[in-house]
Amino acid sequence: MKTKHYILIMGFFVSLSVQGQESWTLARCIAYAQEHASEVRRQTLEQEQKRADYRTSLLNFLPSVSAEVSGQYSWGRNIDPETNTYNNVTTFNNYYQLGASVTLFDGGAIWNAFRQARLDRASAQSAVQQARDDKAITVMEKYVDAVYTRRSIALAEEKWRDSKALLVKTQRLFELGEKSRPDVVQVESQVAEDEYNLLHQRHLADKALNDLKTAMNFPAGDSLAVSALPVDVHTAATLPANRTACDSLMRHGFFLAERPAVTVAAAKAEHARMEWKIQRAALLPKLSLGGGEATNYYKNLTAGYKAEGFGSQFRNNMGEYVYMTLSIPIFNASSWNRARRAKTDWQEAQLDLAEARRKQHDDALQAVLDYHGYAREVEQLQRKVASDSLAHHLSSRKYEEGMLSVYDLHTTAQTLMQSRLLLLQSEMMLALKARLVNYYVTGELGVRN
């Protein structure tokens, strides 16, 4: 009796807490998860960095400009350049230089680096979308689990109440002499079993809700109530767009557009190809052109020597220069190894791209097969639930008339309960697979507020 009272009180307060707060729809849960997911934030930061890298690659086409100032203080014996004799003097030299240089040819390294940065900037958005899609699919799966377990509580509670009502009837029939004491005990055992199933189902529901909070990055201490159903399963089973898309996938074995995962894999393969070209350019000659201006100031600090003024020397010593440099790499083992490593990375990236496309194809086709399978299961289970419900009703009438044993009645009740749970599970999976099929065909999960 204490257990019964505990279940009633717990169910009463749980229902009050759920009714007292706003239910979260699937769209709201996905939006919250995408906003607070660390994976999405990380990809957003990476996107900003790719934009900065692209701007830097543009600046690499401009000449490099440098300025240099140096000072030299020397003393002791040295050779006088005028008399070619040794003397002992102390001097101070001050040098100034301003120069610029531009690369005329580097094997396409700068150009390919620019193309690589431009590609990375474009693919960064696909990486963000991939993170958002992955999070949406994860939350959708956890949301369906949470809805399923919550709905299962209602079925388990209904079964428990029916068993209690049956116990009351059996006790009255026992008092009238129409049922034996073992029948009453067997029904009491059935009630205890249903109490356990109800408690177990509540535990599974709490666990599923906690998994949903974890996937959403939702505060564990805050309450979260999910809506009754993510979609109308009857509408999902007859969506013309999904049915057409499914037939197209089944006939031709392909989907209409590449999803972000494949787009990102293709961008990585192209990035690796550009990197190979950049490393290969290091093995080619490099031609650069430069020029600038330079001047200096000199002063002999030995006693009795008078130097010209700083301004006069700065102007008189001013000179210009221009140069051209051709650098030819003859042997550099590390450069050859980096080029070889880059080519290997490119070949591996091509394999990853092929694998990503294959995986997308397999996942899409599997979603279509599951979608058709669960749609047929829902139709069949609806008929089975109707039949099992009628069979249980007739068995209850026979039991009241003394024509059926408690065990047989319990068997029909368990069969009806299992059919209802299977129907609920198939409905939830149909709703999930309908959205996945829509995602593989249109790129949208079809989530609406």
Regions found by a protein language model. Give the residues of each.
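Bacterial N-terminal signal peptides
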Residues: 7-15
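Acidic, low-complexity, intrinsically disordered peripheral segments
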Residues: 210, 215-222, 422-449
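Bacterial Sec-pathway N-terminal export signals of envelope proteins
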Residues: 20-66, 70, 76, 220, ...
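A short glycine-centered flexible hinge/capping loop motif at secondary-structure junctions
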Residues: 174-178, 399-403, 440
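Small/polar, glycine/serine/threonine/aspartate-rich low-complexity segments that form flexible
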Residues: 68-102, 230-242, 277, 290-328, ...
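Sec/SRP-type N-terminal targeting helices
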Residues: 41-45, 58, 90, 104-132, ...
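Periplasmic alpha-helical coiled-coil/stalk elements that build and connect Gram-negative outer-membrane
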Residues: 134-256, 370, 374, 416
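Short flexible linkers and secondary-structure junctions
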Residues: 21-142, 287, 291, 334-335, ...
